[in-house]
Amino acid sequence: IRTWFFVALAPEGELSLSPDEAVAARWIRPADALALHANNGLSLFPPTWVTLEGLIGFVDAAAMVAATREAAPREFMSRSLASRKALLWEGDAAFETALDESPLPDEETTDRHRLDMSRLPWVYLREGTAL
């Protein structure tokens, strides 16, 4: 499964939805969307959640568009750790063993690139050499 995200400035005027693709829409800041999700007010899937988390630092849409023009696309090959409700990505110390449900290495001494979904709010960790 692939999830694609596109970045562009919205045109002026009213938003027009395709009834085949969406039933509702609203403009919302990334931080507000994540706060709603943390309080069970908005359902998000992991690719959207991680993307929104990465957008929080931008002061406005123009700054975000400018930064993404310079950035290379990021690809995430996910491995699910069902018993821990987590997704792991390359660079995480447990990425190679995630499929066999091995215990995670000592949290304080490892490289981490994961999304912990065991409780709300979700926590995105990208530390050590996984940066």
Can you annotate each of these PLM segments?
Residues 1-14, 48-54, 71-77:
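Active-site segment of metal-dependent pyrophosphate-handling enzymes
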